[in-house]
Amino acid sequence: MLRNTILCSAAALLLVASLTACGNQDNTSSVVSEESAPSSVAEVKYENINPLTGENNLATSAKGQRPIAFMINNNPSARPHWGLCSADVVIEGLVEGGSTRMMWLFSDVSNVPKIGSLRSMRHDFVEIADGFDAVLVHWGGSPQAYTSVSTNGVDELDGLSYEGSYFFRDSTRNVAIEHTGYTTGENILTLMEQKEIETKANSQYASPFTFGKPDEKRTLTDGTCKQVDVFFSTAGYNHTFTYDESDGLYYNSIEGTPMKDDNGQQMAVTNVIGLYMNVSTIAGDGSGRVDMDLSGGE
């Protein structure tokens, strides 16, 4: 089964996709399909494919719905995260100061548990969310991000406007207030209805991912990769994904420590995608915010 995806890069972005999972999962991931003998068995129809993971497990009520994207704090004080192992796709990229921020994507907002801690958006992530036709959930943002929201017409929900009603603070960890913001899928769904935000996916939208059929046999042809090291520019944000042959998943550690959610489950994924791109400091920005070149790379 295809599990959640994380995206990171030594230079800028890390994408972990096809599902972020925690714990043991069945291993049916693959890269190249094998030819099979003709069969008289009727072809199975998959009517509930999750467009972010390729799995045939999307609730009927979520079919044709827009994904929801959450801006997530990745400061060490914000770990362990609430809801990490529930995300379909995790995208991580550089922000100012050499630190990273994450954007988690969900195909079904009703499945979003307590999630956080939430942080402010950056313009690069606004563009990525727009590319997924997603509703962007965040707590504040940079001037460039708010400009991008306006320019691109991105639907967004800002915790600064709804603190105490749909967005909340959890002070039980005794950390700085910027590491305490959270919400839930139920709150976001209610707020979207209140604000009359379109929930149906744009008819012109196509998933950026191409998946095989859930039961399609696959075999790897480009060798074995038992470990993936992802280095950002600053200590505290570097990952190691270690392959486990028993379940076919890559288990994520950050700075040598298993990356776990608030329930104590380690993040494990099927696909790790690294994107290398140019990153530059925005001229005249007093906070040293950066711009990731999303128009190219490899």
List PLM regions with ranges.
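Bacterial N-terminal signal peptides that target proteins for export
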Residues: 1-9
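Core hydrophobic alpha-helical transmembrane segments of single-pass membrane proteins
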Residues: 12-15
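C-terminal motif of bacterial Sec signal peptides marking the signal peptidase cleavage site
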Residues: 17-21
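Bacterial signal peptide processing site
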Residues: 23-26
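A surface/extracellular/periplasmic glyco- and lipid-processing/surface-interacting theme
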Residues: 29-89, 96-298
